[in-house]
Amino acid sequence: MDSISKYDNKCAIHKEHKIKMICATCKDVVCNECILLDHNGHKFGRIDVENSKEIFEEFKNNHLQNLDKQIGINNELLNESNNLFKSLEDKHTENVNTITEVFKELPKLLPIIEIDKIKQLVTLYDENKDINTNISTIVHDYSNNINLITNKYKNTINQINIDQIINDNNSYQHIEILKHCCQSRLLIKDNQNENKINELMDQYKNVNFVNNSEQVKESIKEIFEISNSLSITNVKDPKRVIAGGKECFIYKNDSIIPNGTTHLAIAPSVKTIKIGSIPTSVKYLVLLDGFNVQLKEGMLPQSITHLFVGAIKKPLLKGSIPNGVTDLSLLDGFNQKITEIPQSTVHLYLFDTPLTNFPFQNFILRTSKYKQQFAHPKVKDWNLSTWEPKIEL
C-alpha cells in the first residue's frame, strides 16, 4: 500500500471528494462540495500547523472519550424504537386477524375487499418497518464510524506527535487525523444523531382500526376503515385550549387544578385521574387527543354539563360520562366504543368521527365534517364551527 492510499483523505460527507481546506467558521475540514453547498458564505483557510493542532487537541481532550457514550445513547434509542415497533406489529397482527375472521363469513365477493383492506394495513406496517430499519441502519452506521475512530486512536492517541507528523510533511496521515478529529466532533455535536433518530421515531404511525361489520347491509365496502396517525407517544400537550367561549385550564400530569376552575382541558400527558382531583366547579371539560386514561365512574364530577371528547385512546364505559352532562361532543378522530350515554344528555354533536352507532335517543346534531350515513329519528345538520374547541399546539 503506497503512502497515498494508506490514509483516508476523502470528505466524510461527499465521499468522492478530497479534503482541501479548513472552514474557519465551523472549524471543520471541507472539500470543494462542502464549500459550495454546506458552508456557503463561511471563511476558509489553508490547512496549517496552528489550525490542525487546535482541532486535534479538541479531539484528543474532549471528543474521543465521549464517543463510547454516544453508542450507549444510540442503543437506548434503538431499544425504544424496537419496543414501540413491536407494539405496532402486534396490533397489526391483531387487525389482520380480525379482518380475516369477519370475511370468512361473507360471500365470495368479499375476499376482493379483504385483500384491499389488508393491503392498506400492510402498507402502513411496511412504512413502520422501514422507519425501524432506517433507525437500525443509522445506529449501525454511527456505531461503525465511532468504532473505527476509537479502535484507531484509543491505544495510540498519546503516542501521536502531531507536530512531528506535520513537520515531516506526511500530509496524508496529517489530513486523515484531522478528518477523524472533525468527524468525531460531528458524531457527538449537538445531539444530531439523537435528533435524527427521534425525528424518525416521530414518524411511526398508529393504525386507527374501526370495525363497522354491523353496518354491512348499508355499505358493504365500508366494513373496515383503515387510516393512520402519529404514534400516541408523539401526542404533545397543547399550549392553549378554548372551549365554550373561554380559555381552559390545561390539566397536565401531576398539576393541580385551581379551585373555582370552570373550563378544563385534560392533556395527553395525564397518566391517572384520582376521584375528587377535579373540582366540582368545572362545567366545561375537554378530553384532548391522545388522552389515555380508562375513565371509570366517579373520576369526572357530576358538575360537568358540556363534555368534548377528542381522539382518546380508551373506550367510554358505562358510568364514565357524568350524569350531569347535557351536551356531548365527539370531536375529530374519536373512534372509541361508547357503552352508555347518560339520560341527562340532551344533545349529541358529531364532528369527524367514523362511528355510526350511538346508544342515544335524543337530538343528534352533525357538522359538515361528519360523512357517515346512519338512520336516526332526531338527526339534524348543523353549523358547529363556532362550537368546536380551538386548540393551539
UniProtKB/Swiss-Prot annotation:
Entries under InterPro entries matching the protein: DDB_G0279899-like, FNIP, Znf_B-box
Residues that, per the record, bind Zn(2+): 11, 14, 34, 39
A single MF term (Gene Ontology): zinc ion binding
Protein name, UniProt field: Uncharacterized protein DDB_G0279899
Pfam name, any one: FNIP
Intrachain disulfide bonds: none
Species assigned in the record: Dictyostelium discoideum (Social amoeba)
Zinc finger (B box-type) stretch: 6-47
Alphabetical keyword list: Metal-binding, Zinc, Zinc-finger
